[in-house]
Amino acid sequence: MYMAAPPGVPRWAKTVNGERAALHCLGSIYGLKQSSALLNKRLTAVLKSMGFQPLISDPSVYTKGPPGPDQQLVACWVDDILFLNRRDDKQGRFDFNAQLESHFVMSEWTEGEADFILNIRIDRDWKAGTIKISQPAAVEKLARKFGLDDIKATGAPVIPMKPDLRLAKAVGDEIVPREEFDYPRIVGSLLYLSLTTRPDISTATGILSRFMACPGRAHCEAARQVVSYLVGTKSMGLVYRRTGSSIPVAYGHARTNNFAREGDAQDSTFITYADADLANDLSTRRSVSGYCIVLHGGLIAWQSKLQTTVSLSTAEAETLAATDACKQIIHFRLFLRELGRKQQGPNILFEDNMAAIALVKNPEASRASRHYQLKLHFLKNLQERNIFEYRHCTTDLQLADSMTKPTPRDLFSKYRAWMGIA
């Protein structure tokens, strides 16, 4: 790794022709893109020497020992490390920290239960068997950072975006300058929250992110509404339930409405919802894909994404959404299997479009579907291998509908509860 010589270097640090020399770095420098890779390489070597092995599905997660109560886990995010072991094994935690301290300069560590990591607050209720992750401090910081701390929680909107809102690109003098309202940075901060603990704002932030270079007054007001909504609900977060403590809300409504079957695993097997909104974007007529994956009563993965191609039918748009969901299903099955929690049988994928389900069962190259045959055969192959099972649900019970478009208040509140947000 080389760097340009900074001002003030001795005269000898120059080339023959008088140009300033490049310096060869003997170690990584904090802030460079190579630094985190070098740290990860070193950390992996140290953890392997301690008996840990990285997962194939996620190399930032390490395991030691066979699956069970005595298994130890390490999760890393650059230089932030989370160590998990049996609750009563206090000595194991001290030994782990001591071994790391023999290789690295460590900041003060917290012995016991983690209650805060990567700006995420962790709350446990051992009696109720729940664990909650939320980011109230991040919401407050967002409002304060962008001068929106005048927003009051008492008057906050109950939905992040109006369902009838239609936004178009601003042009010319309609574009609001960043000096007046730093739209890109605000939306970027909202996207971070939507990807960590607040899936209920994913659709709204996805729509706002389409106008990073051309926001108008309406876009700025819409962004302000999302921030206002977060301020009013800053204590909310994703709640997960201990196995056997209760039927997850999202699965309970499926059982009640008879498209979840008796005998289906309820706690240890995740279920997936996939949906699409045809021609959602007014300027490009591209559709929006959405999926939600629920485990232990709360979302573990979700997506609200503008499709890269223009779908010519609802069935095509839904197939593209299901393809994205199934790629995530494959990853989670491998991840859980490596942790010794292999999924039993296929994972259920709820879909509200009968045509999309029928096409996967019989992917004939018709004039209407031959241009996306690859995706249809991909889904068919996964069904035949017992990776997932397509199952129909009615539209009013389609949780992923919340990821495709803004919804009215009552519907939004229902979906938010099904996500496990409380």
Features from the language model and the residues they span:
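Long, low-complexity, charge-biased intrinsically disordered regions
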Residues: 1-422
